[in-house]
């Protein structure tokens, strides 16, 4: 597809009207050279017009079938709003974090909940703050009252020493078989370090390659993600630049969702420093362990909106909140309290 326009952050192409709802590998082609950019999925959505509102630069509709879904929380990570009776939402956003997402409401799942890892509950922002952009979210009714959440972490995939083969024949094969045999919906939460920043560039295996690999290997268990320290860009300094690739590839670095009566919260407790990092130069990959004030502010509003205060709450972070330096490894009769 020819490029119809570019900005400092984006490139635009015209999508053919007859394009199918499917995954596509995107390459930039110049003469005889080509560079893989990402794997994207084309979704078909409603063409319902959402009216503009003064001062609002993100808008859209959350819908199920031919009806809007009211009361759904929508956020850019800093500002959070709730859909109105028509399922419409508007956000006055600084577009600082580069994404918008919904909190999946109880009794629904995103229609685009698939193995391409987009998950259907978030969208990347594409325009400058002065431009209003529209992002719709389609839901389907789903019974997740009983479900299974599998948890994985610290994959450190780098396409070296047969790690991809071992991951495929181990975790992927076993959890896929478990999900196929399950009588209730099965989900997975990867709690960080899906990749290994040290080898992002040496081995050419970064977060887009991880997502592409997972999709191409037919893993059908829907995967939510949390960000780990090794999922930051080792060539850049600072938390916001360091997490940019993650947020563009796997979505918001903090968010929440509901499955059945369980309220899940995913937070990012990595404050990326990466002393000495620059273009082509690996930094020291150092970081602070902290949950930012912006996240805590968002979290307070998120938890306040949970109607049933007795509902189970699951909070996921990559770095442990508590450490016991006096701990020892030994077989015990039961697991001690964390």
What do the PLM-derived regions correspond to, one by one?
Residues 105-127, 131, 200-304:
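Extended active-site neighborhood of metal-dependent phosphoesterases/phosphodiesterases
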Residues 151-153, 187-193, 221-229, 314-318, ...:
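Active-site neighborhood of phospho(di)ester-bond hydrolases with catalytic His/Asp-centered motifs
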Residues 157-160, 196-199, 227-236, 272-275, ...:
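Active-site environment of divalent metal-dependent phosphoester hydrolases
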Residues 176-187, 218, 263-265, 277-338:
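His/acidic metal-ligating clusters that form di-metal
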């Amino acid at each position: 597809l020819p490029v119809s326009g570019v900005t400092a952050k984006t490139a635009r192409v015209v999508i053919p009207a007859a394009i199918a709802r499917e995954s596509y590998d995107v390459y930039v082609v110049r003469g005889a050279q080509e560079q893989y950019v990402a794997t994207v999925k084309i979704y078909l959505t409603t063409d319902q017009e959402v009216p503009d509102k003064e001062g609002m630069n993100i808008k859209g509709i959350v819908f199920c079938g031919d009806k809007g879904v009211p009361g759904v929380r929508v956020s850019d990570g800093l500002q959070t709003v709730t859909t109105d009776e028509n399922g419409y939402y508007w956000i006055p956003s600084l577009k600082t974090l580069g994404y918008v997402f919904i909190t999946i409401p109880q009794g629904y799942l995103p229609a685009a909940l698939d193995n391409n890892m987009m998950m259907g509950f978030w969208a990347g922002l594409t325009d400058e703050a002065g431009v209003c952009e529209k992002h719709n979210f389609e839901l389907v009714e789903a019974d997740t009252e009983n479900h299974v959440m599998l948890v994985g972490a610290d994959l450190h995939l780098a396409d070296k020493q047969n790690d991809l083969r071992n991951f495929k024949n181990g975790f992927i094969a076993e959890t896929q078989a478990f999900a196929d045999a399950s009588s209730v919906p099965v989900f997975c939460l990867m709690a960080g370090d899906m990749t290994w920043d040290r080898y992002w560039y040496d081995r050419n295996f970064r977060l887009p390659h991880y997502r592409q690999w997972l999709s191409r290997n037919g893993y059908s268990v829907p995967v939510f993600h949390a960000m780990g320290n090794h999922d930051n860009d080792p060539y850049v300094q600072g938390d916001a630049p360091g997490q940019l690739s993650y947020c563009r590839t796997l979505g918001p670095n903090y968010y929440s969702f509901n499955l059945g009566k369980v309220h899940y919260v995913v937070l990012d407790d990595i404050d990326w420093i990466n002393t000495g990092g620059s273009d082509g130069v690996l930094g020291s990959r150092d970081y602070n362990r902290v949950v930012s004030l912006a996240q805590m502010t968002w979290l307070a509003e998120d938890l306040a909106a949970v109607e049933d205060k007795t509902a189970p709450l699951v909070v996921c972070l990559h770095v442990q909140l508590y450490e016991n330096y006096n701990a020892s490894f030994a077989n015990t009769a039961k697991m001690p309290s964390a």
